[in-house]
C-alpha cells in the first residue's frame, strides 16, 4: 500500500461549504476521499493530452443499423484498431438503433484516432468516450 501524506489546503469558506454539500450528497465519508478522486480525475484528464500515455476506457456509440454499409464500415474500422480494442458489446436498442460499447486499452494517440474515425461517420448519432488510468 502507498504511504499516505497529509497536507493542508486553504480555500474560501463558501467554496468549502459548497464542496461539503456536494460530497455529502454523493456519500463520501470524508473530504480526503473526495479530494483523492478529484486529483485522480485531474491526472487522467492531463494524461489524455499526452499522446504516448497508456490509458484504458470505453467508446460508446449509437447508430442506425439499417443504413447501407455503416455496420461494415464500423467493423472495418474496429479491425484496423484490433491492437487497442479489448472487446465490443453490441445491443439492439429498438428496430432501428444499435448501441456499441468498445473497450479500449493502449496509447492515447491511437485511441483518439479510433474515436475520431468512429464519431465522424455519417449516421453515427452519438459517441462518447470515457478513459481511466492504467494503474
From Swiss-Prot:
Q: GO: which molecular function terms?
A: DNA binding; DNA-binding transcription factor activity; nickel cation binding
Where is Ni(2+) bound in this sequence? 79, 90, 92, 98
Biological process (GO) annotations held by this record are: response to nickel cation
Matching entries from SUPFAM superfamilies are given as:
ACT-like (SSF55021), Ribbon-helix-helix (SSF47598)
Give the note describing cofactor binding and stoichiometry.
Answer: Binds 1 nickel ion per subunit.
Fetch the HAMAP family from UniProt: NikR (MF_00476)
UniProt-recorded name of the protein: Putative nickel-responsive regulator
